[in-house]
Amino acid sequence: MKLRFTKMQGAGNDFVVLDATREPLTLSPAQYRYLADRRFGVGADQVLIVGASDEPGIDFTYRIVNADGSEVEQCGNGARCFVRYVREAGLTKKSAIRVRTAGGVIEPRWLVDGRVTVDMGAPVFEPARVPFDAAGLQPRELNGFALWPLDAADRTVEAAVVSMGNPHAVMNVAQFGSGGVDEAPVAELGPLVERHTRFPQRVNAGFLQVLSDTHVKLRVYERGAGETLACGTGACAAVVAGIRLGWLRAGTPVDVDTRGGELTIEWAGRSDAPVWMTGPAESVYVGEIDLPEQGD
C-alpha cells in the first residue's frame, strides 16, 4: 500500500501528517506503529490525520495517533502543524480555522510571522472529568488548588491534575531536589505516573521548573510516546497549574522552555477562559512509503 505523507515538527515534537480530506483513511494500530517507527518506518512522536468536515462551522477534523498505535484526544504542537499543513496543501486560505478533535473544538490561527497560535479551550479541573480517581486521597492545598499525592515506586510525589482535552499530571521538580528539570527523574517516574492506576486513561506526566512568574522549563513524558522534545498541551497544563497554585502570573504570556524550543502560553486565570498557545510549526519533507498490509 503506497501512502503519501508529510513530515512536520513543532518545537521538536515531530509528526507524520496524512491527508484524508479526499477519501477516508483506515489503518490498523500496527500500521500506525510502523509509520512512527524510527528504524523501520518514517519516525514520529504521533501520526496526525487531516479530515474533511460536514459539520456546520467546522472546517476540518483532526485525529491524533501515538507512536504506540493508541489514539488520543488532543495534541497542541500537532495542532500548529495541522494549520501549516492545510494552508500549504491549499486546503484553505483562511488564517483562522475551527477544527474538531476527539477532545473538542480548537481554533488555530496563522500569524504573519509564520508561527501559529491556538485557542486550546478552557482547562478542566474536576478530577472525574480529567479523568482522575481521587477517592480516599487527601490533597495538600496551595493557593486554594489541590496537589494530589501519588505513590510511585518507593516515593510519594505531589501532582496538580488538569485536562486540556487530554489528562495531565504536573509535578514541580523542586520536590525532587535542587537539580532543576534537567536532573529530574523523568525516565524513572514518567512511565510510573503515566500508567498510575488513579488515571484510567493513563496520563501525560509533566515535570515543571519555575524560573520566574512568567518563565518556566518543562519536560513531559507523554502517554504512548515517552518523553518528547515538547508537548503543547503539557505546556498549557503546566502554566494553568502554575497560575492556580500561585507560582505564575495570570493574564500575561508565560514562556515555556522545552528541549525542542520555546512555547508561549497565556491564560486569564478564570475557569471558563481559554488557554492560548503560540509556537512554531515547520514542514520537514514530503514522501511516500510502501506501508505493509498488516492488521492488529
UniProtKB/Swiss-Prot annotation:
InterPro entries: DAP_epimerase_AS, DAP_epimerase_DapF. The active site is at 75 (proton donor), 231 (proton acceptor). It is found in: Cytoplasm. GO terms for molecular function: diaminopimelate epimerase activity. Its EC number is 5.1.1.7. The record marks 168, 222 as: Could be important to modulate the pK values of the two catalytic cysteine residues. Keywords: Amino-acid biosynthesis, Cytoplasm, Isomerase, Lysine biosynthesis. It catalyses: (2S,6S)-2,6-diaminopimelate = meso-2,6-diaminopimelate. It is an enzyme of class 5 (isomerase). GO terms for cellular component: cytosol. Its main location: cytoplasm. The keyword Amino-acid biosynthesis applies. Pathway: Amino-acid biosynthesis; L-lysine biosynthesis via DAP pathway; DL-2,6-diaminopimelate from LL-2,6-diaminopimelate: step 1/1. One of its GO terms (biological process) is lysine biosynthetic process via diaminopimelate. Substrate binds at residues 13, 46, 66, 76-77, 166, 204, 222-223, 232-233. It holds the Pfam family DAP_epimerase. SUPFAM superfamilies: Diaminopimelate epimerase-like (SSF54506). Homodimer. Catalyzes the stereoinversion of LL-2,6-diaminopimelate (L,L-DAP) to meso-diaminopimelate (meso-DAP), a precursor of L-lysine and an essential component of the bacterial peptidoglycan. Belongs to the diaminopimelate epimerase family. This is Diaminopimelate epimerase. It comes from Methylibium petroleiphilum (strain ATCC BAA-1232 / LMG 22953 / PM1).
